[in-house]
Amino acid sequence: MEQISVVTTVVDSRSVADVLAAAAVAGRLAACAQVGGQVDSTYWWRSAVETSSEWSVLFKTAPDRVNALVDQIRATHPYEVPEILVSRAESGNPDYAAWVHEQTRP
């Protein structure tokens, strides 16, 4: 099976999440992007504990497209220090993995 990478981030509005998802797929940096429902995050920021509502975005991509995808997310993300996490799927449907690779070719 070809490898798949999953890139995740969170943003402060559904509309921003939708824009990030659409741009990544349109640019063939991700085969699929899923915008998750609202979650509440609690974190340290500037010496204080903050809580805010955020929307998650999960991108499925080929490993050789990860750096370009991360660069695009960083360039358009509204946060000063955006959460961008990359993980690799260890196993899964080989047909889906092949589809991800096919859809992320420039």
Model-found features: residue ranges?
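Positively charged, small/polar-rich N-terminal and surface patches that mediate targeting and assembly
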Residues: 1-106
